[in-house]
Amino acid sequence: MDQTYVKALESYEYLFGLADLSDFDSRMKFQKTTYLLKVLGIDFSGLKFTWFRRGPYCFDLVGVKYKPKPAHSVLRADEIIKIDQNKPLIHELMDKPRDAELYSSIAFLQREEKLSPEQIIHRMGLVKPWFEQRDVEAGIHKMKQILPAN
């Protein structure tokens, strides 16, 4: 079994407690949190995120809740420290599913597709019209302050 999927679930549960991934919003929050943790430097080698309707999505994370887990932690000490350092930020950004979608989508478009702020605003207006332009602009500003440089 690949430990990367287990690490994603363990990281999520370290942040938010026991994962209940039985509904759409909780699964979306898990996906978006895992992507943000990857961007912040947690080693999720092997997890490939693609653009999906609600932002970054990894097909390999589907059903991870039901895969067997090892008896020991797969998170390294340095990764736990990194998660602890970013815990308040992650909770702020990922608390609500709508926010998780907004911030992770902006991060994906900045980092993976290398879009400029103007291009992100345009793309989000096309594919996610439920977000107002001012929300996208504020999200871009916030993500610029917290994301590590490419």
Where are these regions (language model features)?
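Domain-edge interaction signal
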Residues: 1-150
